[in-house]
Amino acid sequence: MGILIFSMIGVAEIAFAVFSIITKSNQQKLRNISRIAAFTGFVVFAILPIIDWSSRYYALAVLLLLLAIIGAIALIRKKEEKKAYKSARVVLKAIGMTVLIFTLTLPAIIFPQHKAMEMTGEYKVATITRTYTDTKRVETYTDTGENRKLNVQLWYPEKADKRYPLIVFSHGGFGTKSSNESLYNELASQGYVVCSIDHTYQCLYTKGEDGRTTRIDMGYMQDVSAENALADRQKSYEYYQKWMKIRTGDIDFVIDHILSEAEKNNVDTAYKLVDTSKIGVMGHSLGGSAALGIGRMRKDVSGVIALESPFMCDIEGVKDGEFVFKEDIYPVPVLNVYSDSSWSNLDQWPQYAENYDLLSGTNATAFNVHMSGAGHFTLTDLALASPLLTRIFNGKKSTTGTEYCLKTINKICLEFFDSYLKGKGEFTADGMY
């Protein structure tokens, strides 16, 4: 829609410029009428609604409103043209307005309108957002001495009357708690309570119940961008230790907090629905690495899903220039989902050595799925929200459809958790999709 709006207004600007040059007139009256018509058309599009009214259109709407007001005032006053016609001025004005319109439609171009994916479960889904304070940990990204605070969001079956398994999700390196919302909704509609965490200072931004917004720590962002296991194993190991300590601490605390709330009276409905004996964890990228770590840390976790994530928590050190991994068999059922971004590199990227080993026969209960034609960020809802950014971050265009990819992931994740958290059937998904 953003491209369509820009094209319509851009073509109109060029047409006015050409017409003005042909008639050797500024055509100010006609231009004023067109400004009013443009704003009126925009409002009609929003009401119908052809335009999904949201923040992506705010700046453009303000500009069109201002131009319409100026045009209306000029028409009412019947203001005559005072500036003499000059073709150069007409051309520069058209170029300037086109550039301005393009700039203001960029949010709609980068984040185009899209329909939310339909849920297939029997339950309608409700959601709440909460802020948790971990009184046992001090925030390490600031020097205020404050305890670490985490903003979380829970999705759960609405109007349900029994208890359901708990699934906790950890976002990727620069992600947010909404990174895989289509997956959370699907799981909740099928009878799960899903909690996604904003890892404060490790997420792009997060907003607490008090309205305070906290943005990503620039030092952390630089570290993630600089990390290169092929070039410096020791430095990467130090990064992994630091990141995983924070991430696993967050997940561990959130699980404990939810389990504690589930045992209380007079708490939010979401907590009352939690079956404290059935817990799964999952995550994307860095978040998946933390989820894999939690699978070893907690005895009450029954299944782990990692969306393209190395076993960072299993790296015990560096010896002779190579990572040293735990030798113990991974203790819980695990589903690893890969895209083209890593699939052909699993045997080459040192941090993925344990992942590569799990592709062959092992004693661990491990499943491996390759989403062929997809990239790293196609495994998240960013692929729906911004195909352009997804293509840029992936480094190439995905050759598989976004909805097909996400629906397949949702289906496989549901089947995995149904099997290992609800005891429904045998999970067999494996291989390429």
Identify the meaning behind each predicted range.
Residues 58-60, 86-90, 116, 356-433:
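C-terminal catalytic-base region of ester-bond hydrolases, centering on the histidine
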Residues 302-376:
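The feature captures the conserved acid-bearing segment of alpha/beta-hydrolase catalytic domains
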Residues 85-112:
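Internal/C-terminal transmembrane anchor helices
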Residues 208-276:
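Alpha/beta-hydrolase active-site loop
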Residues 39-41, 45, 108-163:
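N-terminal cap/lid segment of alpha/beta-hydrolase-fold proteins
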Residues 162-172, 183-186, 194:
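Short beta-strand element of the alpha/beta-hydrolase
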Residues 254-322, 328-329:
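Primarily recognizes the serine-hydrolase "nucleophile elbow" in alpha/beta-hydrolase
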Residues 29-77:
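Membrane-embedded alpha-helical segments of integral membrane proteins
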